Amino acid sequence: MPTLTTKIKGSNNYFSLISLNINGLNSPIKRHRLTDWLHKQDPTFCCLQETHLREKDRHYLRVKGWKTIFQANGLKKQAGVAILISDKIDFQPKVIKKDKEGHFILIKGKILQEELSILNIYAPNARAATFIRDTLVKLKAYIAPHTIIVGDFNTPLSSKDRSWKQKLNRDTVKLTEVMKQMDLTDIYRTFYPKTKGYTFFSAPHGTFSKIDHIIGHKTGLNRYKNIEIVPCILSDHHGLRLIFNNNINNGKPTFTWKLNNTLLNDTLVKEGIKKEIKDFLEFNENEATTYPNLWDTMKAFLRGKLIALSASKKKRETAHTSSLTTHLKALEKKEANSPKRSRRQEIIKLRGEINQVETRRTIQRINQTRSWFFEKINKIDKPLARLTKGHRDKILINKIRNEKGDITTDPEEIQNTIRSFYKRLYSTKLENLDEMDKFLDRYQVPKLNQDQVDHLNSPISPKEIEAVINSLPTKKSPGPDGFSAEFYQTFKEDLIPILHKLFHKIEVEGTLPNSFYEATITLIPKPQKDPTKIENFRPISLMNIDAKILNKILANRIQEHIKAIIHPDQVGFIPGMQGWFNIRKSINVIHYINKLKDKNHMIISLDAEKAFDKIQHPFMIKVLERSGIQGPYLNMIKAIYSKPVANIKVNGEKLEAIPLKSGTRQGCPLSPYLFNIVLEVLARAIRQQKEIKGIQIGKEEVKISLLADDMIVYISDPKNSTRELLNLINSFGEVVGYKINSNKSMAFLYTKNKQAEKEIRETTPFSIVTNNIKYLGVTLTKEVKDLYDKNFKSLKKEIKEDLRRWKDLPCSWIGRINIVKMAILPKAIYRFNAIPIKIPTQFFNELEGAICKFVWNNKKPRIAKSLLKDKRTSGGITMPDLKLYYRAIVIKTAWYWYRDRQVDQWNRIEDPEMNPHTYGHLIFDKGAKTIQWKKDSIFNNWCWHNWLLSCRRMRIDPYLSPCTKVKSKWIKELHIKPETLKLIEEKVGKSLEDMGTGEKFLNRTAMACAVRSRIDKWDLMKLQSFCKAKDTVNKTKRPPTDWERIFTYPKSDRGLISNIYKELKKVDFRKSNNPIKKWGSELNKEFSPEEYRMAEKHLKKCSTSLIIREMQIKTTLRFHLTPVRMAKIKNSGDSRCWRGCGERGTLLHCWWECRLVQPLWKSVWRFLRKLDIVLPEDPAIPLLGIYPEDAPTGKKDTCSTMFIAALFIIARSWKEPRCPSTEEWIQKMWYIYTMEYYSAIKKNEFMKFLAKWMDLEGIILSEVTHSQRNSHNMYSLISGY
């Protein structure tokens, strides 16, 4: 081969352009190989010729990292050119010119404010030079000094461009003359005037030539650094690379090492790393080395080892190809200088061998990717999430407003502007320590007791470390050190002892490893905000995983005691508290104000400026000390905040580290709790300040609601209260750094005094709105009557708009059901949860109709709605019932009533005249009999109505049950001494079920009998009279139902809505025709209950892939249309089989009885006999998964796969007059086999795969010819042959 220019060292730092004749891209394998080749070359621009793509197939060309693609394609699979532009740059096209037949495309635009035009040409074989000449003349107006002309010209431009001596023909001479007239020159020949360099080898002629060219304007040659020929094995052409003088950015792109998690699946790698850890500690763990330094050194050491192992593994994988490629280059070089027929044949053979090896490797990678989709497609998982959310573009900051307010595109100035902004943001450190102390003296914070402090300070245990490591989320970006969560989980047995010692040293010495202070900040633009303003970017911080492990342990500890410090007004990150508490609270306050005649109130939603980023570390430490936190726990927090730093990453480059002198650490599990504790100081100050008057609702004064930095303040006498509130916030800000954004803070003002309203508007910096305020994702309205319009009408509109956007998504009806569950249901549940007011039935009917249209893609439903709502008969694929979910959410308030929680102010203030303890006597209690709700009750009356209705439908007494509390109103009215009830609750239990009724009264356990002997005799007589009464015994002697358990047993409200929904579905069940029963009628069988259960289980367990399960679900649920069914729909008399057999086309006939289908089923049973599996030829087995009792259990998985593969092939030719072929069936089985193999490897379930497939693999391979194996790439994945 001719001499190839050596790749320039560091050329990836420069703009580069590659031109390549790809010789067809209709093969997916070829497209994958092109993607790999491009990633290795990493050009800024890639110009492809001969893509052979038709205009309708343009979407085939997609390359990760080069999303901007300009194409010119014809109507046939010939010609075709494309220009791909790297995501690393911002190219702004102004002019695009295309050839209709796909022979050229021209783009003109700007890059870094410089003009650039690229003309990509593929010349036809006939009269190529004439075509090039005519094209240049035609586009002369667009050719300028900044123009680059590239492509396959199909002709040499110089006699040196051929390996044999021949003069240029007349057309080529004319072309070169036109080029001279236009001041164009061959850039390669300019750089290498005497070098022989070739891009094309003609195998039939055994000749080399350079027919691929890059042409530039003579006056623009100073723009280019070099040009080189790039070897490419996936085409019969080599590529050309042109390197510009322009840097991609002003500075070296930052390489950040990240662990390749696939290494962790390699047994040799795992064993090697375990040994390295052990050896490292043996040699380096001594008294001379501090543990923080030892830990950081070990990470650096392991990083080096992993890099070496990765390189070694890659080298092993590519050794064979590299050897062949080196040999090929040597042969081509010899052949170019002295042609020889035998060598030419060897070159052709060698190229074929390399292509075969690379193709096989590409197929393997494709299959690995396909197996991932095979497992996850149509499930509630990443593929569906990506479909609904759309593609998120790579974020490039190409322009920004500098400190003067001017837009700059200079990369260096962009970096300086961003770094300066965040340096100012994070480096504001207040030194007024005395003022901080004075503020904290004035507003005392609650303290933890000694037991709580002792728990915080107890030594960190290995169990805590292991629990946190196990809970780490996987498949997430690692921190600056590159070690992922999977690394810690894989080597936890080796790392936990080291981390335990490290954390002990930190507890004692208060010094962290230096890597614990590091973080990388990535900037994400806020949606629908001006991206040229730096404040409109959201900084996302990545900490190292080891630092997160320590911080998570500290967070877990403080979480247990946070309620002792934080008032129930704060609900963010507090166990047992939810965001909708504050929404309901705000609505109840608004409702209360609306009912008042004399109004003089204000509700203010405060917006804090960068609240998390401005918290002062000295103040935070002082607050923690005042809260009683001290000792090792406090020392560790001090260490965490002693010298944190962060590198901001802009366009792939890490900027110089900035110190983080203020703000809680982003991405740190401990930060939310520290922020809450600091903000509690302000909340406490607002509560204590008498001049800030809250709103008195009955016996409750309501002043404030908080969730993280979202704060709402409720005040009366707004004229004076707002002044005091602002003064207090300013005083707080002076010691904490907290600042209110007055322009974004909004308020409702309630007053009938117009003069007072005018004064308040003039003196208050907040925006006083008349209609609504956005708060925690819902719209608070000034009057509660507008809640439905502003929240639920808008929700309906949002859902319908989402469904409209998703109508063309490429997924099946099952995938669409899961999209509804994944994207629509959470949105609806959140809104129902926040505002559970009465909603008209029409709202749900409209939504159900829109969802049904979406699921069936505007076609008539194939499966009854009632079937899809029954998890048992639909194979686990259920359509969510929004109305039932809404009812479940409305009813769930009853759970909080039963708990009688003192923290639920949101509930108590709805009816201020009601005794708060009444709520605790409503659920399964006597208080429910006399409760009277006000007509204007927003939430509680509606909850009570639905609760009673549900209990009656379930035939459960809502007043007295086994779950009635020992402290119920029934027993309270007996005037039992409080100490008696307390003793029973502590020693026996809190319900009548625990205490026992009738003969079991206080004698179910030895402890109960002991308590009975200690109770006052009068109390015992009273309790006996109630517990042994006939009515009590009749209603409580049974065990509690699932419905009763939901409201009385769980200590947490986690999963509450789902549990209520499940129980409501049982009573809301609408009877539908069971499809398995219909199959029984058609098969002349009556299935037993066990067979029904077998079929239902088969629907869920026949495969882990939903693609495979879908076919079984469709078959069992009778999804497919038949001639008989269509004849009824169209009211026609023709119900004959579509395959042309002349028989009546029932569903059973189409699947099984048709004489054109029977040969396939004969082949299936022939395979079964070869596997030594004896099954009767009963259609219920392959169609429904109902096996005979004596069927071999261990072989059912194998059989099911064979049957479902056959169903796929029969369905594929459903209306075609042909017999489904055995070859197609074998190919389908092989596809499933391949997908399950890669899935088993990934999940470490190879033995299970082997048991299922080993015998069947051999039979399949014995049934196919050698040519079929080659054409379908069918080789044993188990043995490798």
UniProtKB/Swiss-Prot annotation:
**Known InterPro entries for this protein?**
DNA/RNA_pol_sf, Endo/exonu/phosph_ase_sf, Endo/exonuclease/phosphatase, RT_dom
- The UniProt annotation puts motif FADD motif at 707-710
Which keywords does this Swiss-Prot/TrEMBL entry list? DNA recombination, Endonuclease, Hydrolase, Magnesium, Metal-binding, Multifunctional enzyme, Nuclease, Nucleotidyltransferase, RNA-directed DNA polymerase, Transferase
Keyword Protein biosynthesis assigned: no
Keyword ATP-binding included in the entry's annotation: no
Give the top-rank taxon of the lineage listed in the UniProt record for this protein: Eukaryota
The positions annotated for binding Mg(2+) 2 are: E50
Record protein name field: LINE-1 retrotransposable element ORF2 protein
Q: Which residues bind dTTP?
A: K526, K529, R538, D607, A608, E609, K610, A611, F612, Q666, D709, N741, K744
Q: Where is this region: Carboxy-terminal segment?
A: 1103-1281
Reverse transcriptase domain: residues covered: 505-780
- More about this protein: An active LINE-1 encodes for 2 proteins translated from a single RNA containing two non-overlapping ORFs, ORF1 and ORF2. ORF2p is described in that entry as a representative of all ORF2p potentially expressed by active elements in mouse genome. ORF1p is described in the related entry AC P11260.
> Where does this protein have compositionally biased stretches of type Basic and acidic residues?
329-344
Question: Could you tell me which residues belong to the region Endonuclease activity?
Answer: 1-245
